[in-house]
């Protein structure tokens, strides 16, 4: 069953975030993932959630998403994102058909 990594990002260092974005597509693909949402228009429907940017990645399964996030290859890239702004991230299982 597919799993999704959902990341809310508020960028404070555009140059560093641009560098981060150069490295992520290849790493995401290496772990079987793909971008489903990469920014774009948002509309708050409930609560006070007003994200400036949302990214959704799809992986073949929960374990693949964890392998990507916890991988030694991603660690230095993740550090770039964490220095380039504030973020929140979760992994969630998809719906079994």
Please give the residue ranges for each predicted region.
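Short S/T/G/P-rich N-terminal loop/turn motif that feeds into the first structured element of a domain
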Residues: 1-54, 58-70, 93-97
């Amino acid at each position: 069953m597919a799993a999704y990594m959902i990341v809310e990002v508020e960028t404070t260092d555009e140059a560093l975030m641009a560098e981060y974005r150069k490295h992520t597509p290849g790493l995401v693909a290496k772990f079987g993932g793909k971008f489903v949402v990469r920014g774009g228009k948002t509309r708050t429907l409930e609560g006070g959630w007003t994200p400036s940017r949302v990214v959704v990645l799809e992986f073949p399964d929960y374990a693949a998403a964890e392998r990507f996030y916890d991988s030694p290859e991603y660690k230095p890239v993740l550090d770039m994102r964490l220095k380039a702004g504030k973020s929140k991230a979760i992994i969630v299982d998809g719906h079994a058909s």
